[in-house]
């Protein structure tokens, strides 16, 4: 196990993210496997860790509408749809300034996170964060970040830190709504 692997300080987490590292962290839905969404090397690590099909886009967390507008092309109508969401929802939008490894056809699924831990992270980290479920592609999501070695096996060595908040995350994933289609299309409920 790496030094300060479990529950490192926010300062250490920022160093990891800025250095192209990967973390397991709590979101408002599931535990996420995350990295700096603008860093291609970090994204390649997540593809490897998850055994994910190359070219499949990742969900991306942003701090607020200001950050969202830096990384997505956003109309007033789309902003209104995002503001009206009653539960955690990823919205597919045209992406900009994001690594092409995080997008598909120049689109990505963005979410303004309501998770308390993620909100704290955004006080220190001012870039979008990939937040794909912490699991191998096609498998059940991790419900306890301390079980990462069981889930990821030898690929666990590619993970730089895990944050455990004491809450087992057995919720379902977030909704996905495509705002690039007319009418808007619900991809996952």
Regions found by a protein language model. Name each.
Residues 1-189:
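Active-site-adjacent structural elements in enzyme catalytic cores
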């Amino acid at each position: 196990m790496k030094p300060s692997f479990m529950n490192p300080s926010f300062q250490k987490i920022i160093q990891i993210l800025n250095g192209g590292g990967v973390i397991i962290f709590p979101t408002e839905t599931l535990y996420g496997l995350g990295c700096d969404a603008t860093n291609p090397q970090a994204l390649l690590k997540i593809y490897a860790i998850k055994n994910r099909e190359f070219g499949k886009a990742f969900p991306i967390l942003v701090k607020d509408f200001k950050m969202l507008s830096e990384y997505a092309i956003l109309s007033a109508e789309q902003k209104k749809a995002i503001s009206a969401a009653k539960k955690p929802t990823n919205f597919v939008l045209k992406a900009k300034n994001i690594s092409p490894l995080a997008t598909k056809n120049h689109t990505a699924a963005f979410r303004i996170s309501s998770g308390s831990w993620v909100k704290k992270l955004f006080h220190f980290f001012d870039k979008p964060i990939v937040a794909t479920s912490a699991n191998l592609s096609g498998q059940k999501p991790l419900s306890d970040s301390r079980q990462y070695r069981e889930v990821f096996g030898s690929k666990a060595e590619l993970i730089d830190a895990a944050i455990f908040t004491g809450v087992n995350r057995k919720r379902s994933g977030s909704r996905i709504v495509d705002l690039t289609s007319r009418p808007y299309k619900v991809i996952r409920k």
